[in-house]
Regions:
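Conserved SGNH/GDSL esterase-like catalytic core that processes O-acyl groups on lipids
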Residues: 78-171
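Loop/turn elements at helix/coil->beta-strand transitions in domains of secreted/extracellular proteins
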Residues: 84-87, 151-155, 187-192, 229-232
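Sec-exported extracytoplasmic/periplasmic mature domains
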Residues: 100, 104, 160, 177, ...
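Charged helix-capping and loop-helix junction motifs
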Residues: 169-179, 215-218
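Conserved beta-strand termini and adjacent loop/short-helix elements that scaffold enzyme active sites
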Residues: 117, 195, 236-239
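N-terminal secretory targeting modules
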Residues: 1-91, 95-101
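Catalytic His-Asp segment of secreted/periplasmic serine-dependent ester chemistry enzymes
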Residues: 200-279
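Active-site segments of SGNH/GDSL-like serine hydrolases
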Residues: 160-162, 184-216
């Protein structure tokens, strides 16, 4: 009988020891998880600065996309020569379409230096996504796609005159900015030169709402876009305007808006003496 009681007592002690060990083990687990949770979710006191790690994506070298918030203009230079003019590509609306249609540039009317529509008209509202005639094969593609193929060294943009009367600053600027950025996305090493609007003559009789005052206002929009993107602004149209910004009759075609051959040659001359200096 005594031996049986001793055996029962030993079993009870063993059971108690197991229970104690389990309790210690559970306690250690709880402590470990609590410490981990505190370290992971510890509150940051108000006023404490936290640092968020950002991923930096390199977009490539863009010679003109170096905006510091200032307007980059082209100062007067020595004569860059005909070779410089031959290196330019013009993305233009009806203002400069005579460069192609009058055969003024290298290649005559078949020049590959002018990107525009068959008619030469591109509405200001359609600047960013209008399709142009790709002169190398005659296909209709966007200017951004043409830039991707050609990778032009210098692209001169002369757009915004067509349909200007029906668009305001808040629509014009994002569209113009989108055009520039789409070109750089496809041709990051291209220097972009933006020209102001040529304006209209004092007796312009068009019914599109375009006036000399509206053109002067739009030129400030283009300047702001250049400041924000880093594109160059070249005041070439001053060569064909009077001091008030009105297009001089001697440089205008019969419609009082687009440039005639004399006016176009004035623009080319201005560009020759206000050239981009390559890095």
């Amino acid at each position: 009988m005594k031996g049986r009681l001793t055996a029962i007592k030993n079993i009870a002690w063993a059971f108690a020891i197991v229970i104690c060990l389990l309790a210690v083990f559970v306690g250690l687990l709880i402590a470990a998880f609590t410490r981990s949770g505190e370290e992971q979710f510890r509150a940051v006191p108000l006023g404490t600065k936290t640092t968020v790690k950002e991923e930096v994506v390199e977009t490539g070298t863009r010679p003109a996309d170096q905006s510091d918030g200032t307007l980059k203009t082209l100062a007067e230079t020595t004569d860059a020569g005909q070779e410089y003019i031959d290196s330019l590509v013009f993305l233009c609306d009806s203002t400069l379409i005579g460069l192609r249609d009058y055969g003024i540039l290298n290649g005559g009317t078949a020049t590959t230096q002018v990107w525009s529509t068959p008619s030469g008209v591109i509405s200001a509202r359609d600047m960013a996504d209008s399709k142009i005639v790709y002169p190398n094969d005659g296909s209709m593609i966007t200017a951004a796609n043409a830039a991707m193929i050609v990778q032009p060294k210098i692209l001169v943009i002369s757009m915004g005159n067509d349909g200007l009367g029906g668009i305001d600053q808040f629509e014009f600027m994002p569209i113009y900015k989108s055009l520039i950025r789409s070109i750089w996305e496809n041709s990051p090493n291209t220097y972009i030169i933006c020209l102001p609007l040529s304006s209209v003559t004092v007796d312009y009789a068009g019914n599109d709402g375009t006036t000399a005052a509206k053109c002067s206002e739009a030129n400030t929009w283009i300047q702001t876009v250049c400041e924000e993107t880093g594109a160059y602004y070249c005041d070439a149209m001053s060569a064909v305007q009077d001091p008030s910004g009105v297009l001089l009759q001697e440089f205008a075609s019969s419609n009082g808006k687009t440039l005639n051959s004399t006016g176009l040659n004035q623009i080319l001359q201005y560009l020759r003496y206000h050239a981009v200096t390559m890095d």
